[in-house]
Amino acid sequence: MSNKIIRSALEGHLKTWAAAQVPPLPVFLENRSKVPATGERHLRGDLIPAATLDPSQGAQHRRYHGMYQVGVFLPENEGTGDADDLAKAIEVLFKCPTVITKAGINVRIMQTPSIAQSRPDGAGFWMTPITIRYSADDFS
């Protein structure tokens, strides 16, 4: 249940920011039929949960942690400057120690997001991945 809440919290945080950009940046989410138009600048978010922990040994406390991977996709052959700027802005958006609350769950950003090497994605886009580590405790 909490992975669903965590995904919703992180996606909502990203989508709110992306909608406020000029022009707005579309965000494409996992397992959805919507796809970007040819050459359309966009973001993609993927939740990568790790093993759930039971710190209390009584099953009343579960700790969810993992990574939220955000990809910045810009048309190929337009340079790296815009991709670098967007990646840096997302790094700031999810800076440590950001806390995003959804349905009583506090999703904590555990460290500064990592911006990896950009590369072509094979579909006409230049992709810059940003890895955001999170943790959330569920006491329900």
Residue ranges and their predicted role:
Residues H61-N77, W126-D137:
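Oligomerization/assembly interface segments of phage tail-like spikes and tubes
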Residues Q21-V22, E91-D137:
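Acidic-leaning, charged glycine-interspersed low-complexity segments
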Residues D84, K88-A89:
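Terminal beta-strand-rich extracellular "head" domains
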Residues N3, A83, D121-F125:
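Short capping loops/turns at secondary-structure boundaries
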Residues A50-T52, H65-Q69, I90-C96, I132-R133:
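Short, surface-exposed linear patches
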Residues S56-R63, P120-A123:
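Short, solvent-exposed beta-strand/turn "edge" segments of beta-rich domains on protein surfaces
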Residues M1-Q60, E78-G81, V92-L93, P97-R108:
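Small/polar-rich, solvent-exposed N-terminal microdomains that initiate assembly or binding
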